């Protein structure tokens, strides 16, 4: 069986995007890593949020083998979309004004903490208001988004602003509008989205930069090990006990 031409093209597209992000966003990723390290060093808590498929990159850094134990998932019931029926409910919730405020008010997030918001378009009410309200509460906000949307589409928030307009640090995923890398004869719509690959890589790169910063400051990063290696559960238990006041996925 011959190799798939389109499969190879997708890999090329994803690698190209990752290379571009590495080359063009290195300063921003380093700044985001430093902000995470600052929060860890000062006793703050870390949170990640994403709606729809953007939630995948947020989920990937929570309770993760090889990840920072202090990263907590900020959730909005139904906003992931694929976990509810109909799945389109998730898209609708992203456009509801006031929802972000209710979520933050009922969360443990407080001044001095840090929130990473992942939103590909950054144009809907939920991520925009999440950033606005988080900063008003005194959180440091990192936005992971595609700046192309802010430059080429209209905001769906009453303010006319995008996620990038309300963040302390912006990480640009470089994903094209529509999030589909390939076209082919006989296929009426573009296909093969790469946003999950790229945004997850950016999140991991940011945390790697944070680990580097912590070590440089003489602080041992609170890391988790895989539960599928010998001693992993015991290691994680010790870490979670030591940092139990900053870890909320165990409560």
UniProtKB/Swiss-Prot annotation:
What InterPro entries does the entry give?
A: RpiR-like_SIS (IPR035472), SIS_dom (IPR001347), SIS_dom_sf (IPR046348), SIS_GmhA/DiaA_subfam (IPR050099), UPF0309 (IPR022951)
User: Source organism's superkingdom?
Assistant: Bacteria
The identity of this protein, by name, is UPF0309 protein SGR_3073
Organism per entry: Streptomyces griseus subsp. griseus (strain JCM 4626 / CBS 651.72 / NBRC 13350 / KCC S-0626 / ISP 5235)
Where is the secretion signal located? none
Q: Which family does it belong to?
A: Belongs to the UPF0309 family.
Which Gene Ontology BP terms does the record give?
A: carbohydrate derivative metabolic process
In this protein, which residues make up the domain named SIS? Answer: 36-221
From the broadest rank down, the organism's phylogenetic lineage runs:
Bacteria, Bacillati, Actinomycetota, Actinomycetes, Kitasatosporales
Gene Ontology molecular-function annotations: carbohydrate derivative binding
Pfam short name (any one):
SIS_2
Name the residues that span the membrane: none
């Amino acid at each position: 069986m011959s190799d798939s031409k389109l499969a190879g093209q997708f890999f090329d597209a994803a690698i190209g995007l990752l290379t571009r992000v590495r080359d063009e966003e290195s300063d921003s990723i380093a700044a985001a890593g430093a902000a995470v390290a600052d929060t860890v060093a000062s006793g703050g808590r870390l949170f990640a949020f994403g709606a729809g498929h953007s939630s995948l990159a947020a989920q990937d850094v929570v309770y993760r083998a090889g990840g920072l134990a202090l990263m907590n998932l900020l959730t909005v019931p139904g906003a992931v979309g694929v976990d509810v029926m109909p799945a389109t409910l998730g898209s609708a919730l992203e456009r509801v004004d006031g929802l972000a405020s209710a979520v933050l008010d009922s969360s443990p997030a407080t001044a001095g903490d840090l929130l990473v918001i992942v939103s590909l378009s950054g144009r809907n009410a939920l991520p925009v208001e999440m950033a606005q309200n988080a900063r008003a509460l005194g959180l440091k906000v990192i936005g992971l988004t595609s700046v192309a949307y802010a430059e080429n589409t209209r905001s769906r928030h009453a303010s006319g602003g995008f996620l990038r307009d309300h963040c302390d640090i912006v990480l640009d995923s470089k994903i094209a509008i529509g999030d589909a890398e390939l076209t082919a004869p006989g296929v009426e719509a573009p296909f093969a989205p790469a946003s999950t690959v790229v945004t997850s890589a950016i999140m991991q790169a940011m945390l790697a930069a944070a680990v580097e910063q912590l070590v440089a400051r003489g602080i041992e990063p609170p890391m988790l090990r895989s539960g599928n290696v010998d001693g992993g559960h015991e290691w994680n238990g010790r870490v979670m006990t030591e940092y139990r006041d900053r870890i909320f996925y165990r409560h």
